[in-house]
Amino acid sequence: MEPFIGSAAVRSGALTRRGLQRKYTALYRDVYIHRDLAVTARIRAEAAWLATRAPLAGTSAAAVLGTLWLNPDLPAEIIRADRHAPPRIVAHSWTLAPGETCMVAGMDATTPARTAFDLGRLHRADVAVPLVDALLNATGIKPADVLAVAEAHPGARGVARLRALLPMVDGGAESPQESRLRLVLVRAGLPAPQTQIEFRDLRIRVDMGWWEWRVAVEYDGVQHWADRRQRSWDIDRIALLEEAGWAVVRVSAEMLSRPHVVVERVRAKLRMAGCPV
């Protein structure tokens, strides 16, 4: 059940006041959800819109636009000139240009490009890149769309940071870990890898890599180690790639805590393939 206005539900007879208090919990004043409903970033955003009727922004806009992997515990974000907002909602007094808001399921929110602009300029790269990657993945916008918003707001806080960030984003990432892995490689001076490389004849896709040098990099999450069928398929898949002349570097979550090891392994494979790194 989606968030709803408690007093309206009682007035309509859909709920009694006692039923409202027993089975539902308030996220914001007079905005309720069922006690058994897990609070996601989207649920929090929907509740914030009901509580304020103000345009959603930042991670809240990203949530209603379909972005995955968002932290559900972050405060909701809205845009309001007077910056007045209930507790646990952050209000921004940003000036929006015409065309920088859209309607999503009946709610006002910043457009995908404007949302990416705000996420990219206000967060450090290791936070912003996974967020913007996920937003691009969900909406299909391109870095050029975000750059166009930046050009319309040359004096906005964090624009220089955003411009430096955009060459590092890629909507092909299918998890925050893939985004962080790619960021580690690019920050180390390696050429930006292509994401989601498909081998149609082999029916295989790899997370990222370089066609020119036939080097692939795979992020292996927990399921790659815990699931027997997945592990067996991974072994077969790597063998097929190697038979096709590709070198594959596999990276685990633990290895991401040792980025220098990841970088040197990938660099070594690229050098062996003739890449001048």
What do these predicted regions represent?
Residues 1-159, 194, 271-277:
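Short gly/ser-rich loop at a beta-strand->alpha-helix junction or flexible surface loop bordering the NTP-binding
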Residues 8-10, 136-277:
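Surface segments flanking catalytic/ligand-binding clefts of nucleic-acid enzymes
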